[in-house]
């Protein structure tokens, strides 16, 4: 994949609201123009027209198309053919063949069904798959449930399992991973906790549903000054040692050095 991710704060924008496009692009690192769940069935034709007539920077835009096997996907692709957009998000992805059928596009697979959770490893191996995201709400609905989270806001075990499986599959095959949305717009503390966890385990970005969430996500991906200073100090020590060494009371080996390198890279992208 040659695409360099523009940043960690991504934002969904309904494709039938072209009045919001520029504002979304000004606020987010990447805008996901949504032709699927964010648009009512009666408004999808208008959404495709708006998408074609109101262009954004293709390097900072992804289009969420409709699911494989739907008439809406065919109409989406017809509309996209006349645009500069060549990166799409495929919702409810359940098979590698659904990804390779979109060979003209770079595809982010969205894992949000029981079958998708079981086939994510094969889907991300598709040559045109560049990343993976997971979604909790459709997943739980597909299981016959009605809540992805406990009362305290934490994910139930099945959602955590799919989150981890999606992350592992993406990273095992050299693709990026996006953490799912946080639906409680007012709960910025909960979002912060979840975004910090996404950083800690290796998600490259977290997707927002409201512009007010973007600053929280960016802050989570920006290393604290003390952490960044430590990372730089420990990396400066490497030429002075052979193999494992002790630094500031901590054993430093190859994994610790990789952690330090990740911190410095995140700071450079912030």
Annotate each PLM feature:
Residues 1-270:
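Expand to "…catalyze enediolate/carbanion chemistry for C-C bond making/breaking, isomerization
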């Amino acid at each position: 994949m040659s695409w360099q991710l523009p940043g960690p704060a991504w934002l969904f924008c309904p494709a039938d609201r072209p009045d919001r496009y520029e504002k979304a692009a000004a606020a987010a690192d990447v805008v996901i123009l949504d032709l699927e769940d964010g648009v009512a069935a009666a408004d999808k034709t208008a959404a495709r027209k708006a998408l074609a007539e109101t262009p954004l920077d293709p390097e900072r835009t992804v289009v969420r198309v409709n699911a494989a096997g739907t008439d809406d996907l065919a109409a989406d692709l017809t509309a996209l053919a006349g645009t500069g957009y060549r990166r799409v998000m495929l919702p409810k992805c359940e098979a590698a063949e659904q990804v390779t059928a979109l060979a003209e596009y770079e595809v982010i697979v969205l894992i949000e069904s029981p079958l998708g959770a079981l086939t994510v490893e094969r889907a991300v191996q598709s040559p045109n798959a560049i990343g993976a995201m997971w979604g909790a709400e459709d997943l739980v609905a597909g299981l016959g449930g009605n809540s992805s989270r406990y009362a305290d806001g934490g994910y139930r075990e099945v959602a955590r399992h799919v989150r981890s499986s999606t992350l592992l599959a993406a990273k095992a095959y050299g693709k990026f991973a996006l953490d799912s949305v946080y639906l409680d717009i007012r709960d910025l503390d909960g979002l912060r906790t979840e975004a910090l966890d996404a950083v800690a385990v290796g998600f490259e970005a977290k997707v927002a549903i409201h512009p007010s969430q973007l600053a929280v996500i960016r802050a989570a991906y920006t290393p604290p000054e003390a952490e960044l200073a430590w990372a730089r100090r420990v990396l400066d020590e490497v030429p002075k040692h052979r193999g494992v060494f002790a630094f500031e009371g901590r054993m430093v080996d190859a994994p610790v050095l990789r952690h330090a390198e990740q911190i410095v890279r995140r700071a450079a992208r912030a």
